[in-house]
């Protein structure tokens, strides 16, 4: 049986503002982006690993750690407001023009250096077993329920997300409300048809892939020490410390 073509795409523009040049930041002895490249290359189900970048230095470092740089990302897809859809559409059209269309595209964000390859493989396997699915999103259980959240309209509060059948969900015990999950960026997978034909990163049929525990990412400078410590624990095979327990009323 022919192995499925699975493309790992790591988007890494040069103009990050919250942490300048963060994709090249040294974290526990390696550039941040090197970890995601390593995750993709160590995954037995990934057949090709590329980095989409507009930056020469990121391109050079990515090549050094084993990624392909088949193109330079155009400027319009490398702004602060550029969307994932723009980035992935550009890559897929580039490859389509050259006769290559993968079955799946695995989205690995370079800001998350702590991943377990077996979970990436499990997510890919799940998508391969569900050809009807347009995409897969990794998720985690939300600590706060949106059914107890509010927005301010004028001088007064309005419930942010009313729940059908629960007229006063804001005053109900949290345990009686439906579980809600947030997307955590650990690993996302999408079919090319979803992007090119549906103009979407998720489509209509989205598989859930629950990843438990803390997700370590770099978004702000103050996160750097904790992120480096998490990477060092991960390299030693040590678990994260147990989180503090919070007591919820009602």
What is each PLM-predicted segment?
Residues 32-48, 64:
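A short, N-terminal amphipathic alpha-helix
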Residues 25-26, 51, 107:
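Conserved SAM-binding loop
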Residues 1-20:
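N-terminal nucleotide-binding beta1-loop-alpha1 segment
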Residues 57-106, 115, 121-125:
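Short phosphate-binding loop-to-helix
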Residues 86, 113-204, 210-212:
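Conserved core of the sugar-phosphate nucleotidyltransferase
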Residues 45-50, 134, 214-215:
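Short active-site oxyanion
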Residues 2, 178-250:
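Conserved alpha/beta core of the MobA/IspD/sugar-nucleotide pyrophosphorylase nucleotidyltransferase superfamily
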Residues 5-10, 33, 48-51:
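Hydrophobic targeting segments
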């Amino acid at each position: 049986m022919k192995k499925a073509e699975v493309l790992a795409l790591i988007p890494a523009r040069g103009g990050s503002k919250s942490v300048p040049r963060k994709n090249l930041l040294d974290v526990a002895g390696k550039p941040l982006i090197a970890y995601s490249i390593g995750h993709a290359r160590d995954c037995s189900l990934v057949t090709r690993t590329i980095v989409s970048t507009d930056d020469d230095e990121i391109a050079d470092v990515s090549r050094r750690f084993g990624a392909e740089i088949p193109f330079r990302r155009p400027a319009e897809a490398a702004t602060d407001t550029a969307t994932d859809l723009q980035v992935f559409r550009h890559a897929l059209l580039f490859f389509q023009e050259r006769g290559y269309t993968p079955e799946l595209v695995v989205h690995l964000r370079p800001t998350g250096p702590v991943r377990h390859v077996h979970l990436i493989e499990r997510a890919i396997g799940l998508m391969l077993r569900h050809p009807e699915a347009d995409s897969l999103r990794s998720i985690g259980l939300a600590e706060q329920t949106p059914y107890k959240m509010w927005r301010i309209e004028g001088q007064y509060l309005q419930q942010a997300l009313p729940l059908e059948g629960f007229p006063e969900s804001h005053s109900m015990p949290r345990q009686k409300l439906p579980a809600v999950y947030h997307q955590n960026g650990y690993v996302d997978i999408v079919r090319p048809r979803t992007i090119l034909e549906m103009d979407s990163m998720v489509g209509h049929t989205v598989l859930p892939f629950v990843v438990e525990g803390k997700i370590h990412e770099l978004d702000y400078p103050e996160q750097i020490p904790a992120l480096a410590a998490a990477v060092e624990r991960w390299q030693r095979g040590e678990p994260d410390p147990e989180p503090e327990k919070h007591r919820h009323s009602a």
